[in-house]
Amino acid sequence: MEKLEKTLEEWRSMLDPEQYNVCRLKGTERPFSGKYNGTKTDGVYHCICCNEPLFDSKAKFDSGCGWPSFYEPIADSAMVEIRDMSHGMIRTEVVCAKCDAHLGHVFPDGPPPTGLRYCINSVCLDLVPR
């Protein structure tokens, strides 16, 4: 996959303020505030920054955490996992493999078949219905 690289100023001009804060500055949207938290529409969730496919709606589940949750990405190559030791916690951050947009975190408390919960900020996603 060819990387998409832009300066922070280029990203700022392309994204709205909340998208920029979350995707480029590793912010987090408020729980239960994102437009995809309760969405059940069939489709594919793409990266808001580069349009790379990230998650299939078939892998989405209601975790009750306040953010869209998925038990697996659309492909292992779609994202990169990074150890995150911010805020006094040890977590695993997930970023888009193509453009390095911060997406959220993955936790080992999800449902079968993977046991994983990808907890993703809605503002980082664009749902393309089937």
UniProtKB/Swiss-Prot annotation:
Q: Which UniProt keywords apply?
A: Metal-binding, Oxidoreductase, Zinc
Q: Any note on cofactor binding?
A: Binds 1 zinc ion per subunit. The zinc ion is important for the structural integrity of the protein.
Classification via InterPro entries: Met_Sox_Rdtase_MsrB, Met_Sox_Rdtase_MsrB_dom, Mss4-like_sf
Residue span, MsrB domain = 8-130
So what does this thing catalyse? L-methionyl-[protein] + [thioredoxin]-disulfide + H2O = L-methionyl-(R)-S-oxide-[protein] + [thioredoxin]-dithiol
Needed cofactors, names only, are: Zn(2+)
- Tell me which residues bind Zn(2+): 47, 50, 96, 99
A Pfam cross-reference name: SelR
Q: What is its EC number?
A: 1.8.4.12
- Gene Ontology terms: biological process: protein repair; response to oxidative stress
Question: Which is one GO molecular function term here?
Answer: zinc ion binding
Q: Which SUPFAM superfamilies match?
A: Mss4-like (SSF51316)
Q: Where is the active site?
A: 119 (nucleophile)
| This protein's GO CC annotations | cytoplasm
As for family, the record states: Belongs to the MsrB Met sulfoxide reductase family.
PANTHER family reported for this sequence: METHIONINE SULFOXIDE REDUCTASE (PTHR10173), METHIONINE-R-SULFOXIDE REDUCTASE B1 (PTHR10173:SF52)
Identify the NCBIfam families for this entry. peptide-methionine (R)-S-oxide reductase MsrB
Q: What is this protein called?
A: Peptide methionine sulfoxide reductase MsrB
- Species of provenance: Pseudomonas fluorescens (strain ATCC BAA-477 / NRRL B-23932 / Pf-5)
